Design a protein with these regions (language model features):
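Active-site-adjacent beta-strand anchor residues
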Residues: 76, 131, 487, 518-519, ...
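The feature marks cytosolic C-terminal regulatory regions of anion transporters and related permeases
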Residues: 367-537, 555-563
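Short acidic-hydrophobic, aromatic-tinged amphipathic segments that line or gate anion-handling sites
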Residues: 537-553
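Short, contiguous clusters of charged residues that form electrostatic/catalytic patches at enzyme active sites
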Residues: 28, 188, 192, 468, ...
Length: 564
């Protein structure tokens, strides 16, 4: 494997950077910073942490991802996909457990990038991605029901699981605060209609400003005090916290490792998906492995300053592009804008109604659900539908860690099944049609297969599934031949089970006095078989470069056998 080449886009672009680029990046960065504010606050609160932690994540992680990332226009920060995971970790392990898990995920992301696995991440089956993003969307919506309806649980703790939440909601639904519900509906309505008037100004920002001002006036002059705001639940600190490294112990690392894998996998998928979408719009090509390393560093550093998991955010990245962002400078400016807001304007956030943020997250969950794509996938092959539904329901009913683990296992099994089905083994006992061949060196009369010889043509990878198929085909033929020619010109690779199968076949054949000849082995498979020691068992004189040579060896062997 060649050495890892870490090439952040920022440093490669600075050579040709102009004042015009700086002007557009400054404007785009300011707009994206303002757009990111309500989302960072909403994601922070929904994740079970204070609102400023969401902003700190957008500042620290957003800055690092832009500084070191492999995409020109990627904007990093907290996203809705992590809400479910973060909430569950905090409930089970507390804030310190979240810090450890996030830092571990950062290390895993760095390793994914260093070992050039960025491309592999892109091959995670689409039904799995849609299954768990749709499941996350349903879960996010579920977590917002309490704030949408202003439910009063009278001290009862709301459980973390999906079914438990709805049971608690049902028990306390008689405590609905219709003012809260009205605020949520108005917020959703404003977000929905804003794009009809302006594509550049985000509806979430418009909704938060208008609704916050409206509720403030109602509280001041209308005597309405039953609408909860951020300030009613959280004390907001307008400052960056001191750096602090969590205490580490082996037991915590073992317990949090599965969760860290989930954060890393989800972060890798979302960031690379966002970067790929951006590439399609701006006509560029991101560096997946550099991007993963940057994401890893961001997730390792962010918790030290009180942040939560972060990744590339598609909505903010597209906002950056639509407002003229041309380089990572726009992402750096976005982080600086958020820092200034945190230091000087954060006290105003206490007036934002919780029901308004719930409305913002309802829209986020709707957009994330991809219900049209989900519906379309239900028309696909049954195997894909099974993976989609299992991943979806596991995400909703259990948690994302279980969903990803089970979904990936099922997808791998189905993939191997499909590879098995595509690999064909045919048996030829009379003659080979020269018109269908590409490796023949002599003319047609030499293509007749002698009596007592069978040619097995393998078309596809020779791995553990095919080994079993090979054995079944040989058993079904009944009469034992004197010579078996195994033609492997269309075998791209062979695994350990395939080698074991060939070894067993060779040993069994020798006991039965059946001669084995290999034909047309490609260089890669040849090297694997040679290193495994298989050729010593078979004998190098029985390894032929093409079918002509193999048939010639078979004829000579038949003559010798007949003499004896």
């Amino acid at each position: 494997m060649k050495g890892f080449d870490f090439r952040p886009k920022l440093f490669t672009m600075l050579r040709s950077y102009t004042k015009a680029d700086l002007t557009t990046d400054l404007m785009a960065g300011i707009i994206v910073g303002i757009v990111a504010l309500p989302l960072a606050i909403a994601f922070g609160i929904a994740s079970g942490v204070s609102p400023e932690k969401g902003i700190i994540t957008a500042i620290v992680a957003g800055f690092i991802i832009s500084l070191l990332g492999g995409s020109k226009v990627q904007i990093g920060g907290p996203t809705g996909a992590f809400i479910v995971i973060i909430y569950g970790i905090i409930q089970q392990y507390g804030i310190e457990g979240l810090m450890v898990a996030t830092m571990m995920a950062g290390v895993l992301l760095i390793l994914l990038g260093i070992f050039k696995l960025g491309t592999v991440i892109k091959f995670i089956p689409y039904p799995i991605i849609i299954g768990f993003t749709s499941g996350i969307a349903v879960t996010i919506f579920t977590t917002q029901i309490a704030d949408i309806f202003g439910l009063d649980f009278q001290g009862e703790k709301v459980p973390g699981d999906f079914i438990g939440k709805w049971l608690v909601y049902a028990r306390h639904f008689d405590s609905v605060n219709w003012w809260n519900f009205l605020v949520s509906i108005i917020s959703i309505f404003i977000i929905a209609i804003t794009p009809k008037f302006s594509k550049k100004i985000p509806g979430s920002l418009v909704a938060i400003i208008l609704v916050t001002v409206g509720i403030y006036l109602l509280k001041m002059y209308g005597g309405i005090t039953c609408i909860d705001t951020i300030g009613d639940r959280f004390s907001i600190k307008a400052q960056l916290p001191d750096a602090a490294v969590p205490a580490l112990d082996w037991e915590a690392i073992k317990n949090l490792f599965p969760v860290a894998i989930t954060i890393a996998v989800l972060g890798a998928i979302e960031s690379l998906l966002s970067a790929a979408v951006a590439d399609g719009v701006i006509g560029d090509r991101h560096d997946s492995n550099t991007e993963l390393v940057a994401q890893g560093i961001a997730n390792f550093v962010s918790p030290i300053f009180g942040g939560i998991p972060a990744t590339g955010a598609i909505a903010r990245t597209m906002t950056n592009i639509n407002n003229g962002g041309r380089s990572p400078i726009a992402g750096i400016v976005h982080a600086i804008v958020l820092l200034l807001i945190l230091l000087f304007l954060m006290p105003l956030a206490k007036y934002i109604p919780m029901a308004c943020l719930a409305g913002v997250l309802v829209i986020v969950s709707y957009n994330m659900s991809g219900w049209r794509v989900f519906k379309g996938l239900l028309k696909n092959p049954k195997a894909d539908v099974v993976v989609l539904l299992i991943t979806f329901f596991l995400t909703v009913i259990f948690d994302l860690t279980v969903a990803i683990e089970v979904g990936l296992v099922i997808a791998c099994v189905l993939f191997m099944k499909r590879v098995m089905e595509t690999t064909q083994i045919s048996v030829i006992t009379d003659e080979i049609d020269p018109n269908k061949e590409s490796d023949l060196e002599v003319h047609e009369e030499h293509l007749i297969i002698p009596n007592g010889v069978e040619v097995y043509e393998i078309n596809g990878p020779y791995f553990f599934g095919i080994a079993t198929k090979f054995e079944e085909i040989m058993a079904s033929l009944g009469d034992r031949p004197k010579i078996r020619i195994i033609r492997m010109r269309k075998v791209p690779f062979i695994d350990s089970t395939g080698i074991h199968n060939l070894t067993t076949l060779c040993e069994m054949s020798q006991k039965e006095n059946i001669h084995i000849i290999l034909s047309g082995v490609n260089p890669q498979v040849h090297n694997v078989l040679e290193k495994s020691g298989f050729y010593e068992l078979l004998g190098k004189e029985n390894i032929c470069s093409n079918i002509n040579e193999a048939l010639e060896v078979a004829r000579r062997e038949i003559v010798e056998l007949n003499k004896n």
